[in-house]
Amino acid sequence: MSDLTIKRRVMIPVRAGDVMAEFISFNGDDSGKEHIGIFFEGTKAKADNSIPLVRLHSECLTGDVFGSGRCDCGEQLDEAIDRINEEGGYILYLRQEGRGIGLYAKLEAYALQDQGYDTYQANEMLHLPDDGRDFGIAAEMLQALGVSKVRLLTNNPDKAQQLIEHGIDVAELVPTKVHVNQHNRSYLETKAKRKQHTLKFD
């Protein structure tokens, strides 16, 4: 059983005030990372026993804030806000920059990618894990929120597997769109090939 408990709930208008979201902080995470739950009530009618749509979103400063074309993180976050605001559910915003290696290390990996290495090879050359994220904390956050069953908005099967291993019932995998551009196509193709992300390209 998780030691995580809810610390504070605060309503914040996002999208220039067009969307109301409840930001939720937690007690009991010894990692020192300030993971946040974001709740959207949903704008369309739903049954009382409906299963919430949930997105585990790992922090990406370059994509989420600056709209980097080297990844699809910003577009995925925007899509998650749109869809979960409509259907009701949670975004768990996890402080796992660079698939868990941190911002500075991610920039070092980008420099290696500019030399022709793929995203996973670059991490390996830096003696870092190709994906250092532990989604057990997301399961603990859901348990603290009283959520035991989810519809998971993701193309990444590892997220679902880790939630299941930590006691969360994943009722459905809901794929995100493929946000491809000239800068990130190779990156996305590598994720599909090496980590079995469910991405379908035109």
Swiss-Prot record:
Keyword presence, Chloroplast: no
GO molecular function terms noted in the UniProt entry: GTP binding; GTP cyclohydrolase II activity; zinc ion binding
One term under GO cellular component: cytosol
GO BP annotations, alphabetical order: riboflavin biosynthetic process
Keyword Nucleotide-binding in record: yes
Catalytic site positions: D131 (proton acceptor), R133 (nucleophile)
Binding site for GTP: R55, L56, H57, S58, E59, Q76, E97, G98, R99, T119, T154, K159
Name of the featured protein: GTP cyclohydrolase-2
Gene name of the record: ribA
